[in-house]
A protein has these predicted regions:
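Short, solvent-exposed beta-strand-to-loop segments that form ligand-recognition rims
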Residues: 210-214
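Short acidic, glycine-rich surface-loop motifs adjacent to enzyme active sites
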Residues: 97-114
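Extended active-site neighborhood of metal-dependent phosphoesterases/phosphodiesterases
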Residues: 1-98, 118-119, 123, 127-139, ...
Length: 216
C-alpha cells in the first residue's frame, strides 16, 4: 500500500467482506487518507484525456442480493440499504451518460463460473442486468471470485468481466459464454481512445495475458 507506484487516487467499492463489519468505516476512511476517494456507497466518476471520456459507475452490489439482506447477523448493514433507490440512481446516471465509453463496476458478478451460490447471480441478473442492457453499457467488471473471466451472453452486447485478486486466486473453468478464463492472480488496466476501449488483464509478473476489446 505504501509502494511509490500506488501513490495515486483509489476509488473503492464495498464487497461482502466489508458488509461483515462496519461499512460506514470504509466510507469514513476518505477523511483519513488523501488517496482514498469514496464519496458514497455508490457514485460515478468521469475521466477525460485527449478528447476521450470514460464514465465509471461504481455500485454497491451486496444490498442487491437477497442472501446478504436475509443474513442480518452476518451482514448487518445490507438489509438497511434501499435497493430500489440505488437501482433508480443507476438508471438515472446511465440515462444521461454521454461519454464515449461507460463501464459499471460492482463487487459481485452477473454472469461467471463459480461455486458460489447461484442465487447471487440470479438476483443480479434479475435486478441489475436489465438496466445495464437497456442503456447498452460497454463493460460490467466485478471481483468476488478471485480469478480472471470474460463472458458474453446471448441477447446482450455487454462484456461481463471478472477481475482477479492481488492475493488469493481460485481455480476456474470455462462455461457457456466464456471467452477467456485464468486462475492467475493479478489486476487489470483500462486504455481507451474514441474508437477502442481495452481492458488488459495482467498477471503477477506484469504480463498482459488477455485483453477485452471493444470497438466503435
Amino acid at each position: 500500500y505504501s509502494h511509490p507506484e500506488l501513490m495515486i487516487d483509489w476509488f473503492p467499492i464495498l464487497g461482502n467482506h466489508e458488509y461483515r463489519g462496519n461499512t460506514q468505516a470504509v466510507l469514513d476512511y476518505t477523511n483519513v487518507s488523501r488517496r482514498w476517494s469514496m464519496p458514497g456507497r455508490y457514485y460515478t466518476k468521469v475521466f477525460e484525456k485527449k478528447g476521450t471520456a470514460i464514465r465509471f459507475v461504481m455500485i454497491d452490489t451486496a444490498p442487491l442480493i437477497d442472501k446478504y439482506r436475509n443474513e442480518s447477523e452476518t451482514y448487518p448493514d445490507a438489509c438497511k440499504q434501499d435497493m430500489d433507490q440505488q437501482l433508480a440512481w443507476i438508471d438515472s446516471v446511465l440515462t444521461v451518460a454521454k461519454e464515449d465509453w461507460v463501464v459499471v463496476i460492482g463487487h459481485h458478478p452477473i454472469y461467471a463460473e463459480t461455486s458460489k451460490d447461484d442465487s447471487e447471480r440470479s438476483d443480479m441478473q434479475k435486478r441489475l442486468d436489465p438496466i445495464l442492457r437497456k442503456h447498452k453499457v460497454d463493460i460490467y467488471a466485478c471481483g468476488h471470485i478471485h480469478n480472471f473471466q470474460h463472458l458474453r451472453v446471448p441477447g446482450s452486447d455487454i462484456d461481463y468481466v471478472v477481475n482477479s485478486a492481488g492475493s488469493l486466486s481460485r481455480k476456474v473453468k470455462p462455461v457457456e459464454g466464456t471467452l477467456f478464463c485464468s486462475p492467475e492472480p493479478g489486476f487489470s488496466i483500462f486504455t481507451a481512445d474514441k474508437k477502442e476501449l481495452d481492458m488488459h488483464m495482467i498477471d503477477k509478473k506484469g504480463k498482459v495475458i488477455y485483453t477485452v476489446k471493444r470497438t466503435k
